[in-house]
């Protein structure tokens, strides 16, 4: 019984680690084949203001929140609608 329990510990640890890493990483959008001149302006042209522009290996990189992060306020909105209907 102890051997069966110990064989489950490692996969469970990896599942927890992968779940946490996926939640904490930001989204990267590479603007490849473009030099780093005016990188911030290029990020503002294609992405929202919440993105940060940096230069990596002579390529402009726009880093910021994932599109899924915008869904969180929508949940609060639906909650308020439900409260309005019930009142």
UniProtKB/Swiss-Prot annotation:
Which keywords accompany this UniProt record?
Antimicrobial, Disulfide bond, Fungicide, Plant defense, Secreted, Signal
Q: List the disulfide bonds.
A: 27-66, 36-55, 39-60, 43-62
Gene name of this polypeptide? LCR65
* Origin organism lineage: Eukaryota, Viridiplantae, Streptophyta, Embryophyta, Tracheophyta
One GO biological process term is: defense response to fungus
UniProt-recorded name of the protein: Defensin-like protein 176
Q: What is its main location?
A: secreted
Similarity-based family: Belongs to the DEFL family.
Which cell locations does it reside in?
A: Secreted
CC terms in the record's Gene Ontology section: extracellular region
What is the annotated signal peptide range for this record? 1-23
């Amino acid at each position: 019984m102890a051997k069966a329990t110990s064989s489950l510990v490692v996969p469970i640890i990896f599942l927890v680690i992968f779940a946490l890493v996926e939640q904490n990483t930001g989204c990267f959008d590479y603007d490849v084949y473009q030099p780093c001149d005016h990188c911030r302006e290029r990020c503002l042209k294609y992405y929202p203001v919440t993105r940060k522009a940096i230069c990596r290996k002579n390529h402009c990189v726009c880093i910021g929140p994932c599109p899924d992060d915008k869904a969180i306020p929508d949940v609060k909105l639906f909650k308020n609608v439900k409260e309005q209907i019930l009142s």
